[in-house]
Amino acid sequence: MISLDCDYNNGAHPKVLQRLIETNSERTGCYGFDIYCDAAKKKIMEACQDDDADIFFLSGGTQTNATVIDSILHSYEGVISVDSGHINTHEAGSIEFTEHKIINVPNHNGKLRADVLENFMENFLADGNNMHAVFPGLVYITFPTEFGT
């Protein structure tokens, strides 16, 4: 069974809370340049088997969504999202700032239905003038949705 879950609908694991208590009074460098990020970078380099990898951490979801979506799409592509999708309603224009269009399709209780996506793609591909349109290059799906579904 596939289960797409998030970190917002449960409390922290007791070991995480304990570690926060243990390190609460520590003074470290700023985020990305502290001993914990340095240790994480080393582990990522080991996992990637690349001692020269450049590792950067992002501090929030908006920055992450904008960076990842921009890195995936070509300049002529956009991202399909339901009209109520997080990137369309609560990302403060960050996707558009990267010069990519959010291509809206209707939501059903906050979710993207496969038949809606299939219908959109069939119509897009059948359009003889689609070379003048933003091409869909990515589909954005979230859980939970903005409606909590």
Residues of each region from the PLM?
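Solvent-exposed alpha-helices and their adjacent loops that cap or buttress functional pockets
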Residues: A47-D50, I72, S94-F97, N129-V134
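General beta-strand structural signal in soluble alpha/beta enzymes
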Residues: S3-C6, I55-S59, S81-V82, I141, ...
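Conserved PLP-anchoring active-site segment centered on the Schiff-base-forming lysine
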Residues: S71-T89
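PLP-dependent aminotransferase-class I/II
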Residues: E99-T149
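Short polar catalytic/cofactor-binding loops
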Residues: Y8-G11
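Conserved core of the PLP fold type I
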Residues: D54-L73, I103-G110
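Conserved N-terminal alpha-helix of the aminotransferase class I/II PLP-enzyme fold
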Residues: H13-G61, D83-N88, S94
